[in-house]
């Protein structure tokens, strides 16, 4: 999901995508959801960010993840206990930050759907041995 530089507001395109993802999340109630926010490597504009209490890209990435969590809860009724938000700052790029297109790709949120620990342990027990 793309964001404007320095922003954690969810854009219209991302809202459409979240609608589809929410349906999947609601269908698989036995799974937890990890939401990771990411940024490009552009330093935060200190003056504008200070008004929003954003100190750096770590803060911004966490706010991006948190905005998705709140959107899923408020618009689709996803249970908060199933959601975890985290920020990765600028340290998990998927593209080069040397171009504007690359920076846009790095301003994103990743959504990872995982089985709960007991389900994961069941999968391990069922795995074939070598």
Label for each model-derived stretch:
Residues 4-16, 20, 24, 28-31, ...:
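Periplasmic OmpA-like peptidoglycan-binding domain that tethers envelope proteins to the cell wall
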């Amino acid at each position: 999901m793309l964001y404007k530089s320095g922003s954690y507001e969810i854009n219209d395109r991302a809202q459409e995508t979240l609608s589809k993802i929410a349906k999947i999340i609601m269908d698989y109630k036995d799974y937890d959801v990890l939401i990771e926010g990411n940024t490009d490597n552009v330093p935060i504009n200190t003056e504008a960010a200070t008004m929003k209490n954003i100190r750096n890209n770590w803060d911004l990435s966490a706010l991006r993840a948190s905005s998705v969590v709140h959107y899923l809860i408020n618009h689709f009724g996803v249970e908060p206990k199933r959601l975890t938000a985290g920020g990765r700052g600028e340290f998990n790029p998927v593209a080069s930050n040397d171009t504007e297109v690359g920076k846009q790709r790095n301003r994103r949120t990743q959504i990872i759907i995982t089985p709960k620990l007991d389900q994961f342990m069941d999968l391990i027990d069922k795995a074939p041995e070598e």
